A protein has these predicted regions:
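Terminal, regulation- and interaction-focused segments at domain boundaries
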Residues: 105-111
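Gly/lys/ser-thr-rich phosphate-binding loops in alpha/beta enzymes
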Residues: 1-2, 160
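Short, charged low-complexity intrinsically disordered segments located at boundaries
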Residues: 75-86, 112-117, 151-158, 220, ...
Length: 251
């Protein structure tokens, strides 16, 4: 063991992480051109997946007269978040490791109205010929200990550039409006430095998550009952409905 290794072992963990972060940042700057090109590729992969969801949204409007998507959010992981994650996971810094081991550099979040919309959209996306499902984590059927619910997918999508084609991974999160509301508030509270009676707050948040999950299921069941209880349409009703379908906004 050399003198530098001994110093690293003896220094406090926080200081060691700070030094590692500084070293990672320096290495990132040294590969700035390559790194910027990599971020560009991941940004383009986000566009590819976002377009797929927008196409599905348009199809559902026309085919089923109901839009399952409330909103679509996208994000490219910040450089500081990448450094923090690689240090936390003990991943040595390199462009190769960044591509191979950080699966959520590109992210897209789809907010739905109902729980069954989540699975319908996930199936529609992953059944497409050019989409490869890399990983699936169902936190709806198997919530996290804190109560978090969402469907997480890691997909690989081909992106065509002027001189090459690249397979790029994108993290897709699909959740209901209610799940997103809970996750947003929980995220804010998690980053508060001083939380009095923290254990009680954590228990309350989990209880709220369970209440929200029950409401989600009730709202979905109400919608299904309403769809099933529609009166048998007359010939005039059918004619009017067909005319309305012709006027459905495409874009």
């Amino acid at each position: 063991m050399d003198e530098r290794d001994e110093r690293n072992q003896l220094m406090p963990l926080g200081e060691a992480k700070a030094l590692a972060a500084t070293e990672f940042a320096r290495q990132l700057l040294e590969t700035a051109v390559e790194y910027k090109e990599l971020r560009m590729m991941y940004a383009c992969a986000i566009k590819e997946v976002q377009t797929k969801f927008e196409v599905l949204e348009t199809e559902f409007k026309v085919r089923y007269q109901r839009n399952p998507i409330s909103s679509i959010q996208t994000r490219l992981k910040s450089s500081s978040s990448i450094i923090e994650k690689m240090i936390r996971k003990g991943i040595p810094f390199s462009m190769e490791n960044l591509e191979a081991q950080i699966h959520d550099l590109a992210g897209i979040r789809v907010i739905c109205y109902y729980v069954d919309d989540i699975y319908a959209l996930a199936d529609a996306l992953t059944s497409q010929d050019d989409i490869t499902l890399v990983e699936k984590k169902d936190y709806i059927k198997h919530p996290k200990p804190n109560g978090y619910r969402s469907l997480h997918l890691i997909v690989s999508v081909p992106v065509f550039f002027s001189r090459q084609k690249r397979q790029i991974k994108v993290e897709v999160q699909i959740r209901t409006i209610a799940m997103d509301f809970w996750a947003s508030l929980e995220h804010q509270m998690k980053y508060k430095r001083e939380i009095p009676d923290q254990q009680h707050i954590v228990a309350q948040l989990k209880s709220c998550a369970e209440d929200i999950a029950r409401v989600d299921m009730e709202m979905m069941n109400i919608r299904r009952r309403l769809e099933e209880s529609v009166d048998e349409p007359t010939e005039d009703d059918i004619l009017i409905a067909r005319l309305k379908k012709l006027d459905t906004p495409i874009l």
